[in-house]
Amino acid sequence: MESAADRLARAAAQGRVHDVRALLEAGVSPNAPNSFGRTPIQVMMMGNVHVAALLLNYGADSNCEDPTTFSRPVHDAAREGFLDTLVVLHGSGARLDVRDAWGRLPLDLAQERGHQDIVRYLRSAGCSLCSAGWSLCTAGNVAQTDGHSFSSSTPRALELRGQSQEQS
């Protein structure tokens, strides 16, 4: 027999708002992991902002981390281009400054996929590419962040910039 946590995760993954609401109202925890160890907010249909809002209103952890990839729901929303869901997650306390297992921020993922609306939102929320340190930055990221394009002189400029920041 399928557990309540599995039913809630499946309903969230399929974007079935009515079923998600019914299960939450019946007392199923929005943070209970399914049989694969994932919570409903981790497996929800990212494009259904109503499911996200409902789970969050019932106390889902907007910062839950995937134990394998270290990604969080904001990484998924940014990568897949779901601005409305990202806004709801952020409004519920989701951190935008966390990196996944490959060192990528949600902003990096949105930039890689060309989701400029998400890039604009994340920048307006105070995010910047490579905000956690130079070791994980690419030269192109830093050049773009500063409003420049990448050129053959960029690596030397980055080296000098990094040295001046270390001395500060």
UniProtKB/Swiss-Prot annotation:
| Primary role | Acts as a negative regulator of the proliferation of normal cells by interacting strongly with CDK4 and CDK6. This inhibits their ability to interact with cyclins D and to phosphorylate the retinoblastoma protein.
Q: What family does this chain come from, according to its entry? A: Belongs to the CDKN2 cyclin-dependent kinase inhibitor family.
Keyword set includes Nucleus: yes
Modification after translation is described as: Phosphorylation seems to increase interaction with CDK4.
What gene, per UniProt, encodes this protein?
Cdkn2a
Against Pfam families, the record matches this protein to:
Ank, Ank_2
Is this entry keyworded tRNA processing?
no
Gene3D superfamilies tied to this protein: Ankyrin repeat-containing domain
The ranges of region (Disordered) come to 148-168
Q: Which organism is it from?
A: Mus musculus (Mouse)
| Full protein name | Cyclin-dependent kinase inhibitor 2A
Q: Which UniProt keywords apply?
A: ANK repeat, Cell cycle, Cytoplasm, Nucleus, Phosphoprotein, Repeat, Tumor suppressor
What happens upon changing residue 64 to G/R? No effect on activity
GO CC terms of this entry: cytoplasm; nucleolus; senescence-associated heterochromatin focus
Q: How does it assemble?
A: Heterodimer with CDK4 or CDK6. Predominamt P16 complexes contained CDK6. Interacts with CDK4 (both 'T-172'-phosphorylated and non-phosphorylated forms); the interaction inhibits cyclin D-CDK4 kinase activity. Interacts with ISCO2.
**Mutagenesis or variant effect for residue 90 to R:** In plasmacytoma cell lines
Q: Where are the ANK repeats?
A: 3-32, 36-64, 69-98, 102-131
Report the residues modified as Phosphoserine. Answer: 152, 164
